[in-house]
Amino acid sequence: MFPIFDPIAFGLYLLGYIVMIIVAVVIAPKVASSISGRFTLYGAMALTAVLIVLTTAFVIYLIAIVAAPALAEYGWGFILGMIFFVVLMNLITYIASPFLINVTYGARPDPRLQEIVDAVASRLGAPFRIKAVVVDGPPNAFAYGNFLTGRYVAVTSSMLALTDKRELEAVIGHEIGHHLHRDNALMLLFGVLPSILYYLGVSSVRIALSSSNNRNNNTMLLAAVGILAVVVSFLVQLLVLAFSRLREYYADTAGAKAAGKEAMQFALAKIHKFYFSNPEAHEIISGDKFRALFIYALVNAVANPFITVTRSEIEEIKRSSYSVIQEIFSTHPPIPKRLRFLDQLQI
């Protein structure tokens, strides 16, 4: 029978979380400020991806090679089984999530929306068919699907009421961009790496501490590397979030190509305006388990088709402040930065 409270796992999680908070509050903003504007979008994505992969590979190398004697004696099979379990659970989630989304959000086909999605997909050169569905909820849109279910673009009925045709095409273009860029599969791949490091680290520490001779060099080294793996797993998670934000910029380029930069900006600005005019609805989206898929993960408004946005309001939003700390822990960049990015975009 498994214990309700695991002090080893809790202590390691707390340590990793504290280190992550310190890095996010003290170090990450300074690093972001120092490298801002030094890389193109493609360069930033490539650099972040390389950092994620190399950091993960290095820590696994430490456990596999540096602590090999201890692992050979105390549990190679268990640790490899743990990695397999983490990967398997993520694959099951990836396969099941489209079915869950269809049920959870009441996804239903819409012929008019399908025509728009088909037109935008053709404009962007999509080589595959994308199913269009309308779902319930606050104004939002998201892309999902896999090799079993096919590809979907979901738009809430309130988003249809909020946007005009060009703005809707920009939003749909953003979501089709996620499909073209294979972001669902890519984020699944990168998202599993912190989990592998975390469970690998916890398992290593547990094996070291449960050894009958846990004071020898091998087991002490295994425990030290295990603690390092847990801490690094939280830092890699910050890199994965940064990579996700970069992919959102990348999807915005598809939205701009589909309907123009101005339409993309007006659509984002309308969502932003809803956010500030309806703070009471924040919990609806911020607590949603699928919020990472949304075009705007923090949108929290109920649709009002009579809300409009002017160019002067967009310029004001571009200059508005935002929490750097909140951005670091978010899957999506803040709207002011996305609007400024679109200004600089050459299409």
From Swiss-Prot:
Matches recorded under PROSITE patterns: ZINC_PROTEASE (PS00142)
Pfam families: Peptidase_M48
Keyword terms, alphabetized: Cell membrane, Hydrolase, Membrane, Metal-binding, Metalloprotease, Protease, Transmembrane, Transmembrane helix, Zinc
Cofactor requirement: Zn(2+)
Cofactor note: Binds 1 zinc ion per subunit.
Keyword Cell membrane: yes
GO molecular function: metalloendopeptidase activity; zinc ion binding
One biological process term in Gene Ontology: proteolysis
Record: residues binding Zn(2+): 174, 178, 248
Active site: 175
EC numbers for this chain: 3.4.24.-
Family that this chain belongs to: Belongs to the peptidase M48B family.
Protein name: Protease HtpX homolog
